[in-house]
């Protein structure tokens, strides 16, 4: 029932997304047809969590700030309805235990053979740069054995103004090739494998998004 509702909501929402923003989506052949998988994406705007479920062919679940469930504006009501429809997991960013709980929830989703999306940066980029990734996606991959699918979003930060008015711009969703945890020497400790995976995940996201990394030196600096 939940899956039918998910795809029913997506069927309703997708035409409006295409009408208003016309996202360019590439690399969908990299999404596994079955089994659990991890979507690891850069994060430019709150609407990213709206764009990914609409753009990708299989159902994905993800974590989102719990404050998005408490906004009283019309936009907040719409977001809450959508996040409930896609079974998003609310996270209290101030509580470390909630972060661990979200990863554990993600692990259970992956073991059920479903998709789980995560933003390795931990929060959206307010300056447009790609910030260092935390190891959540890598932890999920090591613990579940599921592949990580890197995704690069571009232009979503320009979709809405502070007043909620749509802005025009080019939006792209680029899906990269799967990163397999099995490709890393299993004799290495989990900690080393997580660090190696995390580095590769962020490298692939950077290539797909075209973002400059936070802290990277520019020419002449």
Per-region residue spans from a language model:
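Short, well-ordered coil/turn elements that cap or connect secondary structure elements
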Residues: 18-20, 57, 83-85, 143, ...
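Catalytic core of membrane glycerolipid acyltransferases/transacylases, capturing the structured
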Residues: 33-96
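Short hydrophobic helices that act as membrane-entry/anchoring signals
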Residues: 2-21, 80, 84-87
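Helix-to-loop junction immediately C-terminal to a conserved catalytic motif
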Residues: 11-43
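Non-catalytic C-terminal accessory region of glycerolipid acyltransferases
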Residues: 4-5, 35, 100-221
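A conditional alpha-helix N-cap/helix-loop micro-motif detector
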Residues: 21, 96-100
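Structural motif corresponding to alpha-helix initiation and N-cap regions
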Residues: 25, 76, 100-103
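A secondary-structure boundary/capping signal
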Residues: 27, 64-65, 87, 119-121, ...
């Amino acid at each position: 029932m939940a899956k039918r509702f998910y795809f029913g909501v997506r069927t309703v929402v997708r035409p409006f997304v295409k009408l208003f923003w016309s996202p360019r989506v590439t690399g969908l052949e990299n999404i596994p047809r079955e089994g659990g998988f991890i979507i690891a994406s850069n994060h430019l705007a709150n609407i990213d969590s709206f764009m990914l479920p609409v753009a990708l062919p299989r159902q994905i679940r993800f974590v989102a700030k719990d404050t998005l469930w408490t906004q009283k504006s019309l936009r907040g009501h719409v977001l809450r309805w959508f996040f409930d429809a896609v079974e998003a997991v609310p996270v209290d960013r101030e509580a470390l235990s909630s972060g661990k709980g979200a990863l554990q929830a993600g692990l259970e989703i992956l073991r059920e053979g479903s998709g789980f999306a995560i933003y390795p940066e931990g929060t959206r980029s307010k300056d447009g740069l790609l910030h260092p990734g935390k190891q959540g996606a890598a932890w999920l991959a090591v613990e579940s054995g599921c592949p990580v699918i890197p995704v690069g979003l571009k232009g979503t930060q320009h979709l809405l103004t502070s007043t909620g008015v749509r802005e025009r711009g080019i939006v792209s969703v680029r899906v990269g090739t799967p990163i397999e945890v099995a490709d890393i020497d299993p004799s290495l400790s989990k900690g080393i494998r997580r660090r190696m995976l995390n580095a590769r995940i962020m490298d692939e996201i950077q290539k797909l998004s075209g973002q400059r990394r936070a802290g990277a030196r520019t020419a002449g600096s």
